[in-house]
Amino acid sequence: MGMQYDVKSQYAIASGLVLPFRTRVKAFQFGAATSSAGTVGLYDNFAIAGTYTRTTTVATVTAVRHGLIVGDWAFIDWSGGANPTDDFYQVATVVDANTFTVAVVNTGDPSGVATVYNDVLVISTVSTGNDVFNIIPGEGILAQNGVRVFLENSVPLTVYYG
């Protein structure tokens, strides 16, 4: 396989959709966090609408055909009043094909709406002193529906794709 010449880049300084089309992530660079270490991640732009109930520190999420297994990471966007923080959560248990649980802080509404992004492409923690740069081997990571990012603590991102 020869050199690929059609690699492009996209810069982002806020969470959201950065590439609204099917592509392959070839490399990425997360800049150093400005205030304290931060979690950053890229995930496929495919969301599953769901609901949640919370009992103390456990949120039970119902999202039809979530496809997750214990130990997987999902980005969950909690909607509504006082709710858990939008963030990456590791799946603690899988009840069935439509229900799973995650650990959350014991605060907020006991139930509400949750949007689940179950296809995490890259997740990393960035310190205040160092950038993170990674080249993806082979053909890169396929994002079927585009690339959405979560950037915490003012971490800038450059994603290389093609």
Model-derived regions: residue spans:
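Short proline/glycine-enriched turn/loop motifs at strand-loop junctions of beta-rich domains
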Residues: 33-37, 65-69, 152-154
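Exposed aromatic-hydrophobic patches
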Residues: 132-140
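Noncatalytic modules at the cell exterior or secretory-pathway interfaces
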Residues: 26-28, 140-153
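Short, surface-exposed binding/anchoring microloops in extracellular/periplasmic proteins
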Residues: 18-32
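Small/polar beta-strand repeat architecture
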Residues: 48-121
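C-terminal interaction-tip segments
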Residues: 1-21, 151-162
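Short proline/glycine- and polar residue-rich coil/turn motifs
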Residues: 94-95, 125-132
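Short, surface-exposed beta-strand/strand-loop-strand elements in extracellular ectodomains
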Residues: 35-47, 159-160
